[in-house]
Amino acid sequence: MGISVDINFPLQLSVNIAVVIVFLKLCTNMQNKNGPMTTDEQYDKIIDACRNTFLKKTADYGTSWRVYRIISVADQIYIKAKRIRNIQEGITQKIDDDIKSEFAGILNYAIIGLIQLDINNDEPEELDAAIVKELYDKKAAMSKALMQNKNHDYGEAWREMSQESFVDLSLSKILRIKQIITNKGVTLVSEGVDANLFDILNYAVFGLILIGEGRH
């Protein structure tokens, strides 16, 4: 009796192996999607949400924030940080805004300040929405790069910090900004206004990340 050989067997085996490989890749991707987010992914999610709010307000009000001088931006951030501190200390609220929304407001005001530092006062007060998004994304990307560099050097030490520390550090940065403005922007060894705003922005992101994780 002769032995029959299925000449299609090698081809079928290859197809089956390919199907298994594709299936395993899909399973791996699903596990990754369902797993914990990376810090970069968390950062991007926070920025996306804050940008969405910022652009919606731009659609409603235009770029009315263009009239703000840096001292005014600093005051707005101070007000929000001080409000978070009051909430943390248990002072009775008469306004419904919570800590999360106040951190988001601080983030967006920090970006406003950074944009204002780049735009000359003699430019048009009203900016096109597309330009606003471009400027916002530019500052957010710079802030993220700063976060990545500091995480590389120090590890993610901020994950072990208290929410109160983020607020206190932001308040101290605001006081520094005001002093720099008083000194006409001149510093001897200290960082400038922009560096302080970037730090404030990242403190707000860190606060929002930890709130999202249920740790604050």
Where are these regions (language model features)?
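Acidic, Ala/Val/Gly-enriched low-complexity intrinsically disordered segments
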Residues: V5-D6, V15-V22
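Short, often N-terminal, low-complexity regions
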Residues: L11-L13
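Intrinsically disordered, low-complexity regulatory regions
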Residues: V20-H216
